[in-house]
Design a protein with these regions (language model features):
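Catalytic metal- and UDP-sugar-binding loop of GT-A-like glycosyltransferases, i.e.
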Residues: 24, 52-54
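Membrane-interface aromatic/basic loop that binds lipid-linked glycans or pyrophosphate carriers
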Residues: 222-281
Length: 281
């Protein structure tokens, strides 16, 4: 990493051969944060790799639960840890919805688009070889959607196995890219993500292997336009709230965005509503 903080002095106090500390010559920055993920991947020496934030936490049972899955479901490209969300003070305030112990890539996509509101790069454990064969973590600006696509690509190799016990803690704070970040860049990332899924659906997922996956595939195709329209609307609303005059810019880009002028006006109303609620609070 290339943190402005004096982390080396902290690391120098720790004498443990299992800990390896690297410092980038240049900071990758928020827009290109996936470059840093892939730099970290290049240093990985084990069979499996977890890319977690420095303020996230592996719970004491995390690796044990993963090993159980490795033994029961060998040769998968990705595994997932049931995760609780914590605040800046390490207080748990939300729990991910439970998942079945194994699911196909079709189920992973469908459930992510329909109810699994929270999912992060750190709660996935990847087979290092598979991840490298895929070209590393999938790069999108601000990593906006990179975690989902990286997991989906790995899950194409046999699905994903999920721990049945909570074993990972993801920290939410006001300074994360999710809560800051440039909304215009986020829109660009969403458009790139949408294009990637369109190609996946057309060229890769079009031959499901059983009735369940046929059902999921049908639902994925039907729900995709609405899913991305909503994702774009929410981001536009945040952008218009911060920069009201941007509404005119977005009104000129309806074809590229894939939403109507009326929907952009609706985004402006959402932005206005958000402003009113914040003022009341």
């Amino acid at each position: 990493m290339a943190s402005p903080e004096d982390l080396k002095s902290v690391i120098d106090k720790i004498h443990d051969s299992r800990i390896r500390y690297y410092r980038n010559e240049n900071n990758c920055g928020a827009v290109n944060v996936v470059d840093n993920w892939n730099i970290c991947l290049s240093y990985a020496q084990g069979d499996y790799v977890i890319c977690m934030g420095d303020d996230d936490m592996l719970m004491p049972n995390c690796l044990e639960e993963y090993v159980k899955l490795f033994e029961k479901y060998p040769n998968l490209g990705v595994y997932h840890a049931w995760t609780e969300l914590i605040d800046e003070f390490s207080n748990m305030f939300e729990l991910q919805a439970p998942r079945q112990e194994w699911e196909s890539v079709y189920s992973l996509i469908w459930n992510r688009w329909n109810g699994r509101l929270n999912q992060f790069i750190g709660d996935f454990c990847f087979d290092t070889k598979v991840l490298r064969q895929d070209g590393g973590f999938y790069k999108l600006p601000l990593a906006w959607g990179s975690d989902d696509i990286s997991a989906v690509r790995a899950a194409l190799k046999g699905g994903v196995a999920n721990t049945q016990k909570v074993c990972f803690r993801y920290r939410v704070n006001s300074n994360t890219i999710s809560n800051t970040g440039n909304n215009e860049i986020k829109i660009e990332a969403i458009l790139q993500e949408r294009t990637w899924y369109q190609e996946l659906i057309a060229k890769v997922l079009d031959k499901p292997h059983n009735e369940n996956d046929e059902f999921f595939f049908h639902c994925i195709k039907l729900s995709m336009p609405q899913y991305y329209a909503k994702k774009i609307r929410n981001t536009l609303a945040d952008d218009i709230y911060q920069k009201p005059f941007h509404i005119f810019k977005w009104l000129l880009q309806t074809n590229r965005l894939g939403i109507s002028k009326l929907q952009i006006v609706y985004c402006a109303l959402l932005a206005f509503k958000k402003g009113v609620i914040l003022k009341v609070r």
